[in-house]
Amino acid sequence: MDVGYVCEWDKRPRTSHCPSIPLVCAWSCRNLIAFTTDQRNEEEKDITNLIHILDTEHPWDVYSINSGHQEVITSLEWDQSGSRLLSADADGRIKCWGMTDHLANSWQSLVGSEVDGDPIVALSWLHNGVKLALHVEKSGVSSFGEKFSRVKFSPSLTLFGGKPMEGWIAVTVSGLVTVSLLKPNGQVLTATESLCRLRCRVALADIAFTGGGNIVVATCDGSSTSPVQFYKVCVSVVSEKCKIDTEILPSLFMRCTTDPARKDKFPAVTHLKFLARDMSEQVLLCASNQCSSIAECWSLRKEGLPLNNIFQQLSPAVSDKQPMILKWRILSATNELERVSAVALPKLPISLTNTDIKVASETKFYPGLGLALAFHDGNVQIVHRLSLQPMAVLYGSSLRPSEEPSLKRQRSPTPCIHFKALQMSWTSLALVGLDTQGKLSMLRVSPSMGHSLDMSTSLRHLLFLLEYCMVTGYDWWDILLHVQPGMVHNLVEKLNEEYTRQNAALQQVLSTRILAMKASLCKLSQTTVTRVCDYHAKLFLISISCTLKSLLRPHVLNTPDKSPGDRLTEICNKFTDTDIDKVMINLKTEEFVLDMPTLQSLQQLIQWLGDFVLYLLASLPNQGSSVRPGHSFLRDGASLGTLREMMVMIRIWGLLKPSCLPVYTATSDTQDSMSLLFRLLTRLWLCCRDESHPCDPDESLIDECCLLPSQLLIPNMDWLPLGNGIISRLQSKLPLRLQFGKPPVAPSYASVQYEAYTRSPTQPKIDHLRRLHLGTFPTEPCKSCTRCGCVTMLKSPNKATAVKQWEQRWIKTCLCGGLWRKMPHTYS
């Protein structure tokens, strides 16, 4: 475990610091982090409680929301999709936040609820019934369906047809449980009920869910001499009103309070957590005094209730079937620890049965097996989530600035800097912590957890987690933290092997996701950086192909099951003629008829296709050099076939509207550029259409491609924007020191690494999705992708239906699946 980066605020006056304010943070499956700070805003009369949101790749670009919470924010919770956030405060107010225009750095309050004046101590979204299980023992199996299986799990509440109903549940300090349901029409149904008849103070609480659709709430009044109470909560809708039913479950007393030697040593319960949101049978408890803590892990089990002999004699039938009861049993306890300041639990859905734990140990798969404890002395420790045995440790000294003199630290009377809030990433390979100075620290958690693993085992575990993210759609940034340049090639090859083993339907679903994953991996090594360009170009080609084919309509409605796009593919594969007009006459051209404004509006996308074909063919003589972008396309039969189909379609559209054709600068006025390019493209495609037996291009084809620069002006391709993310700078293992609001200066080698493939800052900017030139100083507001850096305008300049259809594809996410963020005005 080591430090990736530390991000801090600009120096503020000491009077603005409120150390007594508790801090909270939450980490979404899309690698967005929401957190609070303990700083006063002295410019305003009232204390404003801000919520800060950042993406882990650009931590300096923090977006601060003036939350409107008048009291301290006590809870933050992301939903399963990572696109909505709940916040709750010490006045009983709950707010639901959503992205404005799907921008990760622009948020607005959507709806909310309130329990007037009653502080919220626990908060959770209702369960949507989706639960996936990781089968570590099947990591070598080819099928993703066997590695990651869907677990039967009922939603907390269902609508008509079994669709899960959205909403949230919260527990207040006075012992109330409140549930708010979001109806499809936007209305909010809220109900509040007491957890039990005798209400008592709730200092700590947590919420978990059962497979049967029930909710389990654990509460404690903060005293270790009091029992930890558990309640079953059932939510229903009766006559358009939300109804809550509660039932008391077995409670427990902490083991440390029943031990005579330590009965009064740990008077306060400071942490109460279920080991997982969908695992209500296991709970972690932590009791503390002023200097030290002790942690205990408990499990709820069914046990037989022994009957007295008298009852067995009275009723022989009873003795045949022993009655069962639920009882809490302690699994493990730690020795006396330094005082615990924060706890973070893993989100990786690994089963915690004894068999599964044994399998994980045998396969040496440790991610998800450990939970993190932060201590008041500044240290962080990973302990096994069941046995509570230490697995890894990070000492607080490594978090301090190296330039700070050690003597000065020893003489300082102030308490040690420590984490007040801690959260684990969704693959359990990273930790984020908020310390007493308001700094945000990103910690790498090694997959080996301190054990010695050979390279092949480490690669296998990283590959398994990448596959998990591919199947679930979660962002994989935290996995990239552990990928070294030497691993990239092997990981990409293995990932492709596993992908090709899946059935055709699943491959189609995951086709764009695996390309985005390969691109982000290849960015981490200078030897594979050109392949990033190829993967982005392939994503763009697939998207254009799908969009243009979707515009085609059958001439007669009662046509066979094949769409015009499918027939285009079939005929282009069947007729291998190098003459574009001979291929075209085999198609029903009436299916390609579109109105003139639509064709003209597509010209920028058509121009990119034409330029890309010309660039690829002109680079064929240099195919021995793998450092040139586009190299992988020259042996990719499927992509060349797609380009060939697009050329045929464009040729037909050119007959209807010649101005929509791609524009080439030719040396001869009589030259048919499209026919020439189609002929060369077809010959290249024939060489590699059979992927099992590809052959090298013949000399005559290479000679003709060598002549292309003398016949046509070869365009410069705009491959990808210069990446300003943090991930490639974290490979040195030295912690980076960053500041909120100030982008770091790009290292000199970064510009050299990308120089051949990107525009320099002084060159005119381009809209990478619309293929529009924006000028050197764009006047339109733009947004960029948090993952690949793709830039596009916020508002559409077009009104054509076909272009709107293209733009609607990228309204929520980039073509690589990354989130959008609004670009600062300095871009313009």
Swiss-Prot record:
A GO CC term assigned to this protein in UniProt: mediator complex
Ranges in a coiled coil: none
Keywords from the named record: Activator, Nucleus, Repeat, Transcription, Transcription regulation, WD repeat
WD repeats mapped onto the chain: 68-107, 199-241, 264-308, 622-663, 777-816
Superkingdom as given in the UniProt entry: Eukaryota
UniProt KW Repeat keyword: yes
InterPro entries cross-referenced by the UniProt entry: MED16_bridge, Mediator_Med16, Mediator_Med16_C, Mediator_Med16_N, WD40/YVTN_repeat-like_dom_sf, WD40_repeat_dom_sf, WD40_rpt
UniProt main location, coarse: nucleus
Subcellular localization, as worded in the UniProt entry: Nucleus
Keyword Repeat: yes
Biological function: Component of the Mediator complex, a coactivator involved in the regulated transcription of nearly all RNA polymerase II-dependent genes. Mediator functions as a bridge to convey information from gene-specific regulatory proteins to the basal RNA polymerase II transcription machinery. Mediator is recruited to promoters by direct interactions with regulatory proteins and serves as a scaffold for the assembly of a functional preinitiation complex with RNA polymerase II and the general transcription factors.
Family membership: Belongs to the Mediator complex subunit 16 family.
Subunit structure: Component of the Mediator complex.
Protein name according to UniProt: Mediator of RNA polymerase II transcription subunit 16
Protein source organism: Xenopus tropicalis
